[in-house]
């Protein structure tokens, strides 16, 4: 959350939360989740930024990636913790932007089918966070003497063995 220096934005924060969660950085997630609670709209969704030149109405893109961040943080975006005083959840806010065609609108005020909004809404409604790949790194291999180094040992920190 960069709100101390800028207005912050929900999208960048969502990707940071998901990356931190994938890397096991759960202690760093609380400020971002508090940021989301502080700017959540009464309908349950989020705008890109508050304040914003785009307005502060809920948009599908920002709501979708925020839902993914909540999921990555191990919370339920349809649960009581994310239900507004008006009784709305992030999931309901996103579902409300789905058109009869099955596609999603960016905002209620711009109801046309929006490809990016649709692409971002689908994994969020499927309950999936952004799919970060992880890799297990094994123990470092024993250092080896390499003739080209004049007999010097290779730095053990560079001698990684991937499994």
Question: Which residues are covered by each model-predicted region?
Answer:
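Terminal, non-catalytic domain-edge segments
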Residues: 93, 109-161
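Compact integral membrane and secretory-pathway proteins
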Residues: 37-41
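A general marker of short, structured functional hotspots
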Residues: 31-32, 158
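An alpha-helical repeat/solenoid feature that recognizes helix-turn-helix modules
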Residues: 1-31, 42-87, 99-100, 104-133
């Amino acid at each position: 959350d960069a709100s101390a220096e800028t207005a912050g934005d929900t999208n960048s924060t969502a990707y940071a939360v998901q990356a931190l969660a994938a890397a096991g950085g759960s202690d760093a997630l609380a400020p971002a989740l508090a940021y989301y609670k502080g700017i959540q709209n009464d309908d349950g969704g989020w705008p890109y930024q508050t304040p914003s030149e785009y307005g502060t109405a809920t948009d599908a893109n920002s709501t979708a990636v925020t839902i993914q961040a909540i999921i990555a943080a191990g919370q339920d975006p349809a649960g009581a913790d994310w239900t507004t005083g008006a009784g709305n959840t992030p999931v309901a806010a996103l579902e409300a932007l789905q058109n009869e065609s099955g596609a999603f609108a960016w905002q209620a005020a711009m109801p046309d089918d929006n490809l990016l909004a649709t692409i971002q809404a689908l994994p969020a409604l499927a309950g999936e966070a952004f799919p970060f790949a992880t890799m297990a790194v094994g123990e470092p291999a024993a250092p080896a003497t390499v003739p080209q180094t004049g007999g010097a040992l290779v730095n053990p920190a560079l001698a990684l063995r991937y499994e």
